[in-house]
Amino acid sequence: MSKILNRSLAVETTVLPNGLKIITESMPGARSLSLGLWLRSGSRRETAAENGISHFIEHMLFKGTERRSTQEIARELDTIGGYSDAFTGKEIVSFNAKALDEHAAHAFDILSDMMLRPLFREEDMGKEQGVVLEEIKMDLDSAESQTHELFCKKFWKEDALGWPILGSPKTVKSFHPKMLREYWGRHYVPDNLLITAAGKVKHAAFVKMVDAVMGGMKKGEALPPLPEVKVFPQLARKTKPSLEQAQLCIAAPSYPMGHAKRFGCYLLNTILGGGMSSRLFQNIRERQGLVYNISSELSLYRDSGAMAIYAGTSPGTLRRVVSSVMEELRGIKNGPVSADE
């Protein structure tokens, strides 16, 4: 017997007996439905030898199931006018689809089939390793991406939060079907999954549909607790003479995702560098003309977080940009934020 935990406005939550959580939000007037299958396990759960495997499995789930080929997965979604995508983060993996409500069952069947019955064939792995290696090269060619990776590596140097989500060429080349299947078997279990639907959806009917497909999944073993994370503020530099610009990251620790004060962090992020009206954009780009891109970004995790400011400028104006950023930080620390702002 499934148990309804929450019914607030149009949002309803149910947990199946095997631990699988289902959340729906009914949106009156909508004719479409957005589906999400969320895994509470990203690159942070990997060992050093496994680094990149969460992202690689995300790719491999599109490479055919016991019931569908790669082409059939793509064709069936296109045939119903649907859309599907996936992404891997440091603490989650997401598979999502959007379709008209009349095709919701078909879209969910495709997503759940990918998640429950992947093939992990060696011949597919060889091709996908090539794809991911090209993705890594693309990141290596991006100064902005490398600045972010350098920050993570140094800031969380003793935790997997500091590792790249894509992994390294060495780890990606080492993956094999048995390794993928074992990792998938440990992590893709009901207690670690969340199913969501928003749009034209009736909660009871959606729960019944999910239960019929995934209610028989075995619980699996609970994942071990994550180690306590520490941060290491420091100065780090990486030189690449072929580039025209210097990329800058200035970051500080923030509250974790579930902290009561996180909303203040979101507001601070918006005021500092969240858009064209932000202080950093208006002062350093619009008034001084020192940069093209400048923004701030908030990265919140279960037990850690960081607020980072990113900018790109000519090497000759780097000191002025750093000085201007620090001036804005001192200003927001020492002076009140106006009601209008």
List each model region and its residues:
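Charge-rich, well-structured scaffold segments of protease-associated domains
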Residues: 9, 15, 26, 63, ...
